[in-house]
């Protein structure tokens, strides 16, 4: 089945390439323009459960931008209790408390990643971000709205709140593969993390390109395993450490 999984990855990435380029370019342009407003402007990334890896993917990454503020509340991550994280993912009330821990400013952008786009916390994150004057980019699977209901009190999905929506082209239920044998039917091998990571890096690549077109030097981290990287990276950390909580 390992080759079948790779085939599913390829098919989904090709679908992203065929259908989502305009939305990805719009998201990158929106974020790039927001980064030009102030010397220390950043953009923010948020996700619950496994989607929190989206925030980690862009944070403090070799070849990645330094102006990324990941929102990483332990309540919504798995390492302090998987069941607890699922409970809080459906809880709207926790978002304001979480956002109050971070420096979120008007006219900045936040990327919110939620495969289903149906749970209370990521939807409320979009609502609260817009209330605070941020622009919201959502990465989600649009299949869910067609097949299930929202768990947010508004009855809305994440895609209904966001300013720009990028469909990760993932399946309902996330699992890419299925096997039927006798009475057994099992779905397995999730895709969403792979697809979200592809989209996030496409966005970031386009942001870097936009900055270069404007004759700006993108604040990109070097790998800590190459010579000369430490001095370069420390300068970027010094520039953004007051804005990026987890630096």
UniProtKB/Swiss-Prot annotation:
Disulfide bonds: none annotated. SUPFAM superfamilies: SIS domain. One of its GO terms (biological process) is carbohydrate derivative metabolic process. GO terms for molecular function: carbohydrate derivative binding. Residues 31-213 form the SIS domain. HAMAP family: UPF0309. Belongs to the UPF0309 family. This is UPF0309 protein Teth39_1980. It comes from Thermoanaerobacter pseudethanolicus (strain ATCC 33223 / 39E) (Clostridium thermohydrosulfuricum).
